[in-house]
């Protein structure tokens, strides 16, 4: 039988683990190898000395604590704290806008009774009454007046054990600190023309950006880091902040080393990455209430931007990996809204963006080292997608958000319609963000991640700014370009090939002769006969079989086998613990998931549909375990796959694992299975439809779900190649004997061939329908 190929792939999956283990052992071993490159013209090895190179950044990193600076008069920048560190009592700092605000800070030592002191403020003598009741802490006092000749008033004192104070200009105000350490907080004074206020500091001070205000508060309450209190820290003039430091250029081409034929070039580039996240939405047939698949797919995007006064043409390809599959079913009725599968990317997912531009850096990107990149993060939010139903209110999938964080960069290859491009692949890890996504008018709500329904949220693209640096081995002659095929590090992107191959496979369905299909489906098909039609198979047969099994191991069919094995083990354990007849019979739940309560007479129709649908999804495995002489769906599926592989002009050893795995999951999605009990037949489909009828009259009888569940354990499962509706139509129009009916029920290939050779339109239409379901 042709379905032997699927059983072999399932039975030999252990070889995948062995292969992976062997590769891991080989990768973990280190071996020193000395290579003698020989004459330069007769070797592919680089005749250069691989130096460490350098990675320079165009981004200025602002220090957290800038200073200390010498006492001076200057206009502090807005949104920067001026952290003052006086060593003795007296005036600490004073500032004015020369209009309506004169403000100064005075420091008073501990344990000072109320007394009047004379201070020089803004060039004039002023009598200020001060006091400090604290025995240990110093006291900062804010004195302020609103006219040049006005009297000073005192505000917001700060009792400090650290002897530190801070002021800042921000949003039309002058901010200070008040209270008592270690619980000091900020206070402010409204000031016009606040940005023109000059400060005169009488002590050493530091500058801290407002973005680090929490750190400034920490210093005020707990003191400066110990390193700032050593004699080696020497204050400098504030004018040192005005020194123009040389920053890295937006475009840099640096010569690292050079020989007669080769040279090492370091390329540093500021880049802007724009990308789109594409999706595919497939609606099921029928009345228009079902969607079969909503998934992500790779997307190419071409754009241009200005870099260093030069227009750069760029191209990106965005793809995702590690998607999470969700589904929703509103019920079993044809008019119930349902989505069989929709994909969501979450924390366990990755987004890949392949980037290329027309600069010199990408011209010879073949032998590369010291590859590094720094990129910003970007948030991707989901938009609203309405499921257009024929009647009723539309369900709407809305919300969902993730943030992309840079997680690495490698070399890759982008495939466009006309050319292959060496490019950089930027890998992004994900973190989920608010809001969660939901499907309005359904029970789906509060789920986190980004669904594939509308990942761009009406935006044309997402944008990330960053910089990359690499050292590339290039020919010394700038006019020569290293051939792209020499690269051994690029990743061959198969998605474009697979898309074309799927289209070819689907078009080949119409070229397969129905009369030959049954004969070919009965032939034993093993792995090597399956691969015999592919070029260069003999040389790569072993590795190709391993690759096929490695991919097949992750298929839904293989996962179902693993789940079923665990269920059977649990069921066997329950039998050993209890000797009752009911417990032994309950082992059927391993195949069916039907509980003991399923025998309740009052079981609702919807409940039966759900149970029979659950059973049907596992009957494929049961049929594989109890092979009969009849033909089954997997025989047709495997033979269709084999025939299409032989006829295909695009299949390769790289795309074969994908095609076999997809075919095992997607060929003939609408399957119906039956169990024969004397003259009664039980028939169920994976979409929840069920029939029970007598063979002699084809009259329906009540469907006993518990009896059906019990029969699953002991009776062979048969693929309903000719389903109940087709049988009834055949009997009503042509009339068939009881023997013919039994043979068709058992999917006897001889009887099927006879009806096809007689050009029976009903049987031919059913087989043609199965052939057309063999699509990707």
Swiss-Prot record:
What are the start and end residues of every segment in region (Spike body and stalk (antigen domain))? 248-479
**Classification via InterPro entries:** ConA-like_dom_sf, Rota_A_VP4, Rota_VP4_MID, Rota_VP4_MID_sf, VP4_concanavalin-like, VP4_helical
Binding to sialic acid, annotated site positions: 101, 190
SUPFAM superfamilies, alphabetized: Concanavalin A-like lectins/glucanases, VP4 membrane interaction domain
Q: Tell me the segments the record calls region Hydrophobic.
A: 389-409
Motif, KID motif: chain positions: 644-646
Query: Which BP terms from GO are recorded?
Result: permeabilization of host organelle membrane involved in viral entry into host cell; virion attachment to host cell
Site entry: Cleavage: 231-232, 241-242, 247-248
Disulfide bond positions: 203-216, 318-380
Its GO CC terms are: host cell endoplasmic reticulum-Golgi intermediate compartment; host cell plasma membrane; host cell rough endoplasmic reticulum; host cytoskeleton; membrane; viral outer capsid
Q: Where is this motif: YGL motif?
A: 448-450
Q: Which residues form a coiled coil?
A: 484-511
**Annotated region Spike foot: where?**
510-776
Q: Which UniProt keywords apply?
A: Capsid protein, Coiled coil, Disulfide bond, Hemagglutinin, Host cell membrane, Host cytoplasm, Host cytoskeleton, Host endoplasmic reticulum, Host membrane, Host-virus interaction, Membrane, Outer capsid protein, Viral attachment to host cell, Viral penetration into host cytoplasm, Viral penetration via permeabilization of host membrane, Virion, Virus entry into host cell
* Domain of life from the UniProt record: Viruses
Where are the stretches annotated Spike head?
65-224
**Alphabetized Gene3D superfamilies for the sequence:** 1.20.5.170, 2.60.120.200
Its family? Answer: Belongs to the rotavirus VP4 family.
Q: What else is known?
A: In group A rotaviruses, VP4 defines the P serotype.
Q: What is this protein called?
A: Outer capsid protein VP4
